[in-house]
Amino acid sequence: MRETLYFKDDDSRLSFLQGNYVTLTNMSDHDIDRICRYHLSPINISFQTMNPDLRCKMLNNRFAGEALKKVDILNEAGIRMNGQIVLCKGVNDGKELEFSIQKLMEYLPNVESVSVVPVGLSKYRDGLYPLEPFNAQDAGEVIDLIEKYQKICMEKYGTHFIQASDEWYILAGREVPEEERYDGYLQLENGVGMIRLLLDEFHDGLERRITEKQSGAGLPWEGIREISLATGKLAFPYLKRMSEEVMQEYPGPVSYTHLRAHETCADL
């Protein structure tokens, strides 16, 4: 067979090589032994919940709860792990989320970080579990709970450990945290800290450009430049804000900024 056909989406090798998240349900004892023997880490794990019964229900797999015992083996072997919890309203949020956070803290420092991300919903859900989207109030409650445990983890372990993805802050109408709260952006590819990193890199670049312009060291920005930015709905306010900041520094020949947020399939 083709080489790529030897890999499944839930294959631990993809987690090590490409950062994929695995549920552990498809991992045999041989797979776990191989990870421990060769010390393949970090391994990214989709926990969803630390409640075994609820995990079986969420993953529609009667072995999903039992699979959590594999985390104990990996932890004892010193395997570094990162985790994610895909949050579903009325299912694994609230008290269940708090329970999961508390249980995952027991695996520090080998579990280095855990991100909490909202479940992605589309209109194509015929025959699927009737999930509801989170609203602004829900997002605020999720953030408050996460930030509560960030303070606890920082005081006890010197790390914020549990992270809220950018969507929560945008949905709640809150500013994203400062860079220090992301612990080196361990969950960047999972949508945690992307907005903060973008803002900080943008402002660093803009300040450098302004300094060059004032000193005459940089190349002059002459003529009219038309720039198109393609973005989704969630990131649109930030792109608009940054474009307006550029316009304040270069109001000359370019007299306006026009951005439009187009609908996408994911509605993001």
Question: Where in this protein do the model-derived segments appear?
Answer:
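Conserved Radical SAM active-site core
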Residues: 1-110, 121-149
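Hydrophobic beta-strand segments of well-ordered beta-sheets in folded domains
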Residues: 43, 224-229, 253-255
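Short, solvent-exposed amphipathic alpha-helical segments in soluble enzyme
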Residues: 61, 242-251
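Hard-cation-handling environments
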Residues: 143-225
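Structural motif
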Residues: 166, 229-235
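Conserved small/polar residues in nucleotide/adenosyl-binding loops
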Residues: 257-264
